[in-house]
Amino acid sequence: MIKISIDAMGGDFGPEVVIPGAAKALERHPDIRFIFFGLPAQVEPVLARYPKLKAASEFRASQVAISMDDKPSQALRAGRGKSSMWQAIEAVKTGDAQACISAGNTGALMAMSKFCLRMMSDVERPAIAGIWPTLRGESIVLDVGATIGADARQLVDYAVMGAGMARALFEVRKPTVGLLNVGTEEVKGLDEIKEAGQILRDTPLDGLAYSGFVEGNDIGKGTVDVVVTEGFTGNIALKAAEGTARQMGELLRQAMRRTLLAKIGYVFAKGAFDRLREKMDPNKVNGGVFLGLSGIVIKSHGSANAEGFCSAVEVGYDMVRNRLLEKIEADLAHFHHSHPHVSNDGGEAAKA
């Protein structure tokens, strides 16, 4: 049995999406048990519509719901101990749950997670890891917005953690890892990127295969299983990719409506277009993982539908089932033992 805590108030639609999404996840994984946190007047009526889910769940009342517009510091002050978001995270800390899922405010969720769960030993800064559809399947990209900037050691930590996530999700024994750079040549890029590359070349790890530098166009190609970058660049890349996907979808729709011949052609090609739409649908690869914490926290898109929230739950389910934290901690311990003298710098939080 896998226990998952849910911030039922998170996201643009709150319980109206969160609860149906959890119900879908339960249909696919009957061994999940949920703990929902939220405002009783909003959560209980929706939960009552799903008898099977209600029977496999526990509801715990909260006093506060964190707004999508709240600043992290405000959310922490107002919501500590009594908000649905904090209580869902705290359930992981106390052992009541093995993973927490929220579609709420990203900055608030990160601040509360760091404050409540703390960081893994020897990890200074968390990263948000996103699942990216590619020509070869799926890749993991991190950091996509937890912090701005990263030094060499932090980038290597991201590489180790991202590889652990790839093993858990993709069941790849030794994921390939690349550092995002302005070119593939070793002489190109910022000093911290070149230093991180040197460290990864000099410190062989059983859990990953370092493939060198990759460029922006390699992300969509699926050149490597894990793409490592710092949060500012990663967040821009993520938003650019999402925007491009929407743009391409709209351009295709316009083209198919332009002439009678195009409309007839669409009828015959509808199956192919449907498969393309499904491949590019953010709801199919929803769920950003907060890596570096001493517990599993998954961030769902705030605008996700029920299928999207279900995807985020399934990411958490796979993380627990494949013992993600234990694997990452073991890999990090090996790296820091092998390379204990890498310097690091501070940084400031990025808003995703």
UniProtKB/Swiss-Prot annotation:
Swiss-Prot/TrEMBL catalytic activity: a fatty acyl-[ACP] + phosphate = an acyl phosphate + holo-[ACP]
GO cellular component: cytoplasm
Lipid biosynthesis listed as a keyword: yes
Enzyme Commission number(s): 2.3.1.274
GO molecular function: phosphate:acyl-[acyl carrier protein] acyltransferase activity
Pathway involvement of the protein, from the record: Lipid metabolism; phospholipid metabolism
Function: Catalyzes the reversible formation of acyl-phosphate (acyl-PO(4)) from acyl-[acyl-carrier-protein] (acyl-ACP). This enzyme utilizes acyl-ACP as fatty acyl donor, but not acyl-CoA.
PANTHER family registered for this protein in UniProt: FATTY ACID/PHOSPHOLIPID SYNTHESIS PROTEIN PLSX (PTHR30100), PHOSPHATE ACYLTRANSFERASE (PTHR30100:SF1)
Quaternary structure and interacting proteins, as annotated: Homodimer. Probably interacts with PlsY.
Protein name: Phosphate acyltransferase
UniProt organism field: Brucella anthropi (strain ATCC 49188 / DSM 6882 / CCUG 24695 / JCM 21032 / LMG 3331 / NBRC 15819 / NCTC 12168 / Alc 37) (Ochrobactrum anthropi)
